[in-house]
């Protein structure tokens, strides 16, 4: 009987407490977006998350398809090609 009480005491100590109302936020696109069933007004859906919800990104986020960091310096000289 003492062994049963010891087991229950250990089980209660090890188990994490359950907090109602808090949900785990599933992030996507390298922690830039949030997985949601429907995106907010200022967000754009992009691809899908593991749980088949939309990956919602802020409208100002730029997406790099190549996977490498790009230079985002948008000066006037870099917008147009130089003419000979």
Swiss-Prot record:
Its GO CC terms are: extracellular region
Q: Give the main localization category.
A: secreted
In this entry, which stretches build a coiled coil?
Answer: none
Protein location: Secreted
What InterPro entries does this protein's entry cite?
Defensin_big_dom
Can you list the disulfide-bonded cysteine pairs? Answer: 28-55, 35-49, 39-56
- Its signal peptide is 1-21
**An example Gene Ontology molecular-function term:** lipopolysaccharide binding
Q: Which UniProt keywords apply?
A: Antibiotic, Antimicrobial, Defensin, Disulfide bond, Secreted, Signal
UniProt-listed Pfam families: Defensin_big
Q: Which protein family is named in the record?
A: Belongs to the beta-defensin family.
> What role does this protein play?
Has antibacterial activity.
Q: What is this protein called?
A: Beta-defensin 119
Q: Its encoding gene is what?
A: DEFB119
């Amino acid at each position: 009987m003492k062994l049963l009480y010891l087991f229950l005491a250990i089980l209660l100590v090890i188990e994490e407490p359950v907090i109602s109302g808090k949900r785990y936020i599933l992030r996507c696109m390298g922690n830039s977006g949030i997985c949601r069933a429907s995106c907010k007004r200022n967000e754009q859906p992009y691809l899908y998350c593991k749980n088949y919800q939309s990956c919602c990104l802020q409208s100002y986020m730029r997406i790099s398809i190549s996977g490498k960091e790009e230079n985002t310096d948008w000066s006037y000289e870099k917008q147009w090609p130089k003419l000979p």
